[in-house]
Amino acid sequence: MSRVCQVTKKRPVTGNRRSHAMNATKRRFLPNLHRHRFWIESEKRFITLRLSAKGIRIIDKKGIEAVLEEIKARGEKY
C-alpha cells in the first residue's frame, strides 16, 4: 500500500539531508500517516482510512460523512 493520505493526498516528497559540512545526500520526507477506524452511522459499519494527522483534523472539523462524500466525488473508493 502506498504512503498516501486518503483525504489530503499528502505523499512522500524528496529533499536533501545536510551534514555539518553542508554535504547533500538525498532523503525522503514521509507523511505522518495513521490507520484510523471510523463508525459510519448511515451505513451502520466501520471503515478504516489511512490518514495523515492533518486528514484526521479535517475529519474532526467537517465530519466523516462530508469527507466521504468528497472522496466519492473524486471517484475513489474508501
From Swiss-Prot:
<dbReference type="Pfam" id="PF00830">
    <property type="entry name" value="Ribosomal_L28"/>
</dbReference>
<dbReference type="GO" id="GO:0006412">
    <property type="term" value="P:translation"/>
</dbReference>
<keyword id="KW-0687">Ribonucleoprotein</keyword>
<keyword id="KW-0689">Ribosomal protein</keyword>
<dbReference type="InterPro" id="IPR037147">
    <property type="entry name" value="Ribosomal_bL28_sf"/>
</dbReference>
<dbReference type="InterPro" id="IPR026569">
    <property type="entry name" value="Ribosomal_bL28"/>
</dbReference>
<protein>
    <recommendedName>
        <fullName>Large ribosomal subunit protein bL28</fullName>
    </recommendedName>
</protein>
<comment type="similarity">
    <text>Belongs to the bacterial ribosomal protein bL28 family.</text>
</comment>
<dbReference type="GO" id="GO:0022625">
    <property type="term" value="C:cytosolic large ribosomal subunit"/>
</dbReference>
<dbReference type="InterPro" id="IPR034704">
    <property type="entry name" value="Ribosomal_bL28/bL31-like_sf"/>
</dbReference>
<dbReference type="GO" id="GO:0003735">
    <property type="term" value="F:structural constituent of ribosome"/>
</dbReference>
<dbReference type="InterPro" id="IPR001383">
    <property type="entry name" value="Ribosomal_bL28_bact-type"/>
</dbReference>
